Amino acid sequence: MKVFITQLIYVIPGKEDVFDQFEAIAIPIISKYNGRLLFRIRPSVETIIETSIEPPYEIHLVEFDSAQDFEEFKLDEERKQFLHLKKQSIKEAFLIEGTKI
């Protein structure tokens, strides 16, 4: 069953370039594991209708053919070599896993 991963990503101010370096490596790897990046959004004040939390720097919506594909993506050796960039640049993130209804 397909699984959808939504992430709300909060980047440390001033570390946007480091975050972009990590994304340039991680995003292409998604397709190796039957995944597709459906959306990568940087919301602005003008696009937010209502919120009770701090707006994230980016929102990602990714589809994988199965939960196992997502787990294998997280274990990818190339991606793991660059996790230090993620740790250096991300203040916090929310990961929401779901299915299509």
PLM features per residue range, with description:
Residues 34-38, 84-89:
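A short, aromatic/hydrophobic, helix- or strand-capping loop or linear motif
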